[in-house]
Every structure is written in C-alpha cells, then in structure tokens.
Amino acid sequence: MSYLVPIVIEQTSRGERSYDIWSRLLKDRTIFIGGPIDDHVANLVIAQMLFLEAEDPEKDIHLYINSPGGVITAGMAIYDTMQYIKPDVSTICIGQAASMGAFLLAAGAKGKRFSLPYARIMIHQPLGGVQGQATDIDIHAREILRMRDMLNELLTKHTGQPKEKIERDTERDFFMSAAEAKEYGIIDEVITVRK
C-alpha cells in the first residue's frame, strides 16, 4: 500500500521552496522510525544519521520511534551507528517502542531519552525460527542465544538494571507504560509538552 507523502512549502526571502515532510523534518535533524525495522529502514536511518553528522557533528539528532521492532541485525546496524557518530542521538517514543524499537529507545544519549505519556514500551528475548538438518538448527539456536546474551548485556548497560533482572524480564513480553519505562531506566523523562 502506498501513502501520500505531504508536501510543505517554506517561504524565504528568496522565494518559496517545497519539501516532502520527511526532508523538511530532516532539516531540523529529526529522523523517524515509523514501522518494522528491516535492512531497508536501517539503511535509510543510518544514511540520515551520517548526513546529519557531516552537516554538524556537535548538534543533537532526534530519533522518533513508533515501531513494533524488527530484524536484530538491522537494529544493531542502527545501534552501532548511534554509538559511533559524534552527535548525541536523542530518542523519543511515540505510540510504541517494542522489541528492537525499545532497545534503540534505551540506546539514546543518557539524559536525552524520552517518551510521550501514553506510549507503550515492550522488551523481550529475540525471536527466531529455522528448519533444516539438526546441525543447522543447532547452529541457529546457538546464534540466537548469543544475540540474546549480547542484547541483555547492552540493556544492562543502558538501563542500569542487573543482568539477572533483564534476563528474567525479557523471558516473555514485558510491557511498560512510559512512567514504568522511566523507572526501569529505558527512558529518562516522560514528556507532555515540548520545551
């Protein structure tokens, strides 16, 4: 299904200029993840982050997240880029940040991780499925367990929660309100009004 992308017109002293809404928001250093995270989404988000870093390495980037999660490797590509680039990446949850979306929300710069009040946040262990020979299934099972351990370690680092608690809580879907996510350490502040 294709969607109409709104066009905004900006008036300047030199005349009018029209932008699609995403390009206009990018001028304000705002990036959106507005759906499942796959390689295509990751490549777009990473390209925008690298562009904004080249434009001004000292100015924050604002990453808005409304995502049910997605592919671990795609999410980790975004995560690694967030940690690699010079500008702080402020994360803001709107709607929901689940699974890899919640992980990226927690990975924002300390003190700059936010959620709107009625958003929901959910963490859980990696999901996966494989079929084939027993050896192949074993290889993939060990890889999923390795990724689970890596994600739990990183959530421990970003939230300040003990690893044992993260392991317990991610055993099944663990839903939180914005206020609960703040208490958990996934975000720093619940925001109701833009400052």
Swiss-Prot record:
Record-level GO BP terms: protein quality control for misfolded or incompletely synthesized proteins
Listed InterPro entries: ClpP, ClpP/crotonase-like_dom_sf, ClpP/TepA, ClpP_His_AS, ClpP_Ser_AS
Gene3D superfamilies reported in the protein's UniProt record: 2-enoyl-CoA Hydratase, Chain A, domain 1
Catalytic machinery residues: 99 (nucleophile), 124
Subcellular localization: Cytoplasm
EC numbers for this chain: 3.4.21.92
UniProt KW Hydrolase keyword: yes
EC class name: hydrolase
Keyword entries, A-Z: Cytoplasm, Hydrolase, Protease, Serine protease
CC annotations in GO: cytoplasm; endopeptidase Clp complex
GO molecular function term, any single one: serine-type endopeptidase activity
Pfam family of the protein (one): CLP_protease
Disulfide bonds: none
Superkingdom per UniProt: Bacteria
Reactions mediated catalytically: Hydrolysis of proteins to small peptides in the presence of ATP and magnesium. alpha-casein is the usual test substrate. In the absence of ATP, only oligopeptides shorter than five residues are hydrolyzed (such as succinyl-Leu-Tyr-|-NHMec, and Leu-Tyr-Leu-|-Tyr-Trp, in which cleavage of the -Tyr-|-Leu- and -Tyr-|-Trp bonds also occurs)
PANTHER family documented for this protein: ATP-DEPENDENT CLP PROTEASE PROTEOLYTIC SUBUNIT
Assembly behavior: Fourteen ClpP subunits assemble into 2 heptameric rings which stack back to back to give a disk-like structure with a central cavity, resembling the structure of eukaryotic proteasomes.
The family this protein is said to belong to: Belongs to the peptidase S14 family.
Function statement: Cleaves peptides in various proteins in a process that requires ATP hydrolysis. Has a chymotrypsin-like activity. Plays a major role in the degradation of misfolded proteins.
Protein name, per record: ATP-dependent Clp protease proteolytic subunit
UniProt source species: Carboxydothermus hydrogenoformans (strain ATCC BAA-161 / DSM 6008 / Z-2901)
